[in-house]
């Protein structure tokens, strides 16, 4: 994903300027990568209610348990709110309470498949 612009820039006033602007952001095919975003809603099996943050089966316990697979916690006021891995992946909490794997930039779909399967076996 490209970084957001740091200034408003000059307004585009022709089709050619638009084409040149888009072309300037293109990477050569050798640098192309794909990444996975995989969201999971965490809920309690017996009540089907969303899992709380605290508790034996809560989001905090899930994030802390995943650390045994090499995930490093991202803390806010001492509480884990995300995880990062040396391989370029991260696990984040989304606004709706879901847990998201943001995969590493990989070369092909078979690598993303392996990444998701590994993640799901850890969860």
Regions found by a protein language model. Give the residues of each.
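Terminal catalytic/cofactor-binding subdomain
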Residues: 1-123
């Amino acid at each position: 994903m490209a970084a957001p612009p740091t200034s408003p820039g000059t307004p585009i006033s022709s089709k050619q300027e638009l084409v040149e602007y888009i072309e300037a952001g293109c990477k050569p095919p050798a640098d192309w990568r794909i990444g996975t975003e995989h969201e999971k809603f965490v809920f309690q099996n017996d009540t089907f209610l969303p899992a709380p943050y605290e508790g034996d089966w809560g989001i905090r316990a899930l994030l802390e348990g995943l650390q045994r697979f090499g995930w490093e916690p991202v803390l806010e006021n001492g509480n884990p709110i995300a995880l990062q891995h040396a391989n370029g992946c991260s696990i984040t909490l989304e606004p709706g309470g879901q847990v998201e794997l943001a995969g590493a930039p990989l070369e092909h779909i078979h690598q993303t498949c392996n990444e998701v399967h590994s993640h799901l076996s850890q969860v």
